[in-house]
Amino acid sequence: FAQWQVGSATFLVDRDGRVIGPAARGDAFVLVRENRAGALNPGDSVPAEAVRAAVALSELLPPQWQPPGDAFDYAPDTGISVAMRNGWRVRFGDDEELAWKVATFQALAAEIARTGARVQLVDVRFPGRPYYR
């Protein structure tokens, strides 16, 4: 299970993206925030690959790279991303090849630290074509 937030409302969803109902305050599930207006009702669907990606990333990312409040962000055009504590935004996209994406991100983070580059965005959505700026 995970939580899916749209606007100020938060819903409990299953791994297939089906909305179960309103989330209870204090639920300890991974949170996915979608920045759009609208409402969800039980039985509606959200992108299952985004739910699965956020849950998997909460397990794959080492503690220093976990997002504050276990909150992952979702946008239809970029998929799942994480606002890191150091100010970087890291785009992971969908739930495909997440172990590779995390390993690639960690290698890029080490390279960024080594060179002292100033970074705002790291994108590992596409195997073989990661980048940062």
PLM feature spans:
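Charged, solvent-exposed interaction patches on well-folded alpha/beta domains
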Residues: 1-133
